[in-house]
């Protein structure tokens, strides 16, 4: 199926997990608390989690764009009142393409491209 794919990833999460696992888990919970409702509000569906990464799909281009902007805005506002070590910074990759959802997994070139765009 052709759909809009969002791939998010927390910057520095792997290093933070090695340095302070409790803080990493605390920030991940806060990350999820901020991001999940925004995706849902914009009619997206979270289809996969890979540690600190979220893969979501959307049916409309404006919804995935709105969701991305709202996520970055919410995190920017949240980070203003936190020290550098407690900031949540994410990268987001977006793509429109063909994916296959099977057994709670996402496959296909569309997924691969979105995940490869995210680090850029």
Language-model regions: role of each:
Residues 1-70, 74-77:
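Catalytic NTP-binding/metal-coordinating core of nucleotidyl cyclase/transferase enzymes
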Residues 55-120:
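Catalytic beta-strand-to-alpha-helix segment of the class III nucleotidyl cyclase homology domain
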